[in-house]
């Protein structure tokens, strides 16, 4: 650990000579110097800032102060709760998993479970979450009839529920969407009031699907208002992309196709990049999270950054773009001294806690700024 230097971790996931690689390397160098300047102004060792760090969206490059030597191949900052919370703001998320008989093939059920658990790890205490499994019929995680706050205990229980899923039966899209929409519709008292999203995964062709079914799904989405989006994920060679594409495009979303054995977890966890442009710009997010290496609880003040002149975001709909939406560039954070009380921090707009950090029963849920 060195307080005289910053660490720049270049990801193995991209090409350094690409346009994204060159941009992220340049910005990493700038932030490396900026972090050192901030640290130099902190005279008190006991009350100085903690870590300063930033990560970039395109490749996942990461820079932090103080410098530390570590192996980062397995660490992707873009799916850490501090990053997603700052990028997307508070959100209501329903994850829908196909557990029909065909999910036994090519290890698809294991991929779906890994993806669902990775999604849960991106949430914080200001988010609300629901889980639906479907085959011939559909049911919700933990028997919930509304969304649940994404606290540490809720997330842990949902992960256990996911681990217990087993594939069997047919592929009933109608039952799945009715359950997912029901969670969102009946959660007026259990909602952030901000972005809403359904993440729908299937590997097969629906047992029955008509024009009326499509109209029903679209109307239920429209009833949720302008902050709702529906994202679909087609897993494997048997997935019906035509139906999933129409469903997502009817609801301001996007379709991802993932081959058998592909990185489904990263594809599904990337949903927040479409929510990011909807949040209030220049809004600092206060987030408790557990340090990746030490497991210690930390408090971070994070700010998402966007490209000023960015191209439109690609989707699978219409002409292939969503329209003029700012592109997420990355997130920069500073850990605040932990002598700051929880009460003081939670009185600030946008405060949140990582799903891995249990919420304090003595504190009210913080006020939210979308």
Predicted regions span which residues?
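Soluble non-cytosolic domains of exported or imported proteins
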Residues: 17, 21-32, 87, 91, ...
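Von Willebrand factor
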Residues: 37-59, 87-151, 173-181, 192-202, ...
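Surface-exposed intrinsically disordered loops and tails
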Residues: 149-153, 164, 189-191, 211, ...
């Amino acid at each position: 650990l060195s307080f005289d230097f910053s660490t720049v971790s270049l990801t193995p996931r991209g090409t350094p000579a690409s346009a994204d690689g060159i941009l992220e390397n340049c910005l990493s160098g700038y932030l490396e110097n900026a972090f050192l300047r901030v640290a130099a102004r902190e005279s008190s060792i006991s009350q100085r800032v903690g870590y300063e760090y930033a990560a970039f969206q395109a490749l996942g490059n990461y820079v932090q102060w103080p410098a530390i030597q570590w192996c980062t191949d397995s660490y992707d900052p873009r799916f850490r709760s501090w990053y997603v919370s700052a990028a997307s703001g508070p959100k209501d998320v329903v994850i829908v998993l196909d557990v029909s008989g065909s999910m036994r093939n090519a290890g698809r059920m294991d991929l779906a479970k890994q993806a669902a658990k990775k999604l849960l790890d991106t949430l914080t205490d200001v988010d609300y979450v629901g889980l639906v499994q479907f085959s011939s019929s559909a049911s919700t995680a933990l028997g919930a009839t509304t969304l649940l706050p994404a606290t540490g205990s809720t997330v842990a229980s949902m992960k256990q529920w996911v681990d217990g899923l087993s594939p069997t039966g047919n592929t009933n899209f109608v039952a799945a969407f009715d359950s997912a929409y029901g969670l969102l519709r009946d959660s007026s008292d259990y909602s952030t009031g901000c972005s809403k999203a359904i993440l729908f995964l299937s590997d097969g062709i629906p047992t029955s699907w008509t024009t009326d079914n499509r109209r029903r799904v679209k109307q239920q989405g429209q009833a949720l208002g302008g902050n709702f989006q529906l994202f679909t994920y087609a897993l494997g060679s048997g997935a019906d992309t035509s139906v999933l594409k129409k469903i997502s495009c009817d609801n301001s979303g996007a379709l991802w196709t993932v081959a058998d054995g592909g990185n489904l977890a990263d594809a599904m966890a990337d949903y927040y990049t479409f929510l990011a442009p909807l949040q209030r710009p220049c809004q600092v997010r206060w987030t408790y999270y557990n340090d990746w290496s030490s497991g210690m609880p930390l408090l971070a003040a994070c700010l998402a950054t966007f490209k000023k002149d960015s191209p439109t975001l690609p989707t699978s709909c219409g002409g292939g773009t969503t329209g003029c939406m700012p592109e997420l560039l990355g997130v920069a954070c500073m850990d605040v001294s932990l002598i700051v009380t929880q009460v003081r921090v939670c009185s600030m707009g946008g405060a949140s806690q990582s799903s891995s950090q249990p919420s304090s029963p003595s504190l009210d849920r913080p006020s939210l700024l979308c």
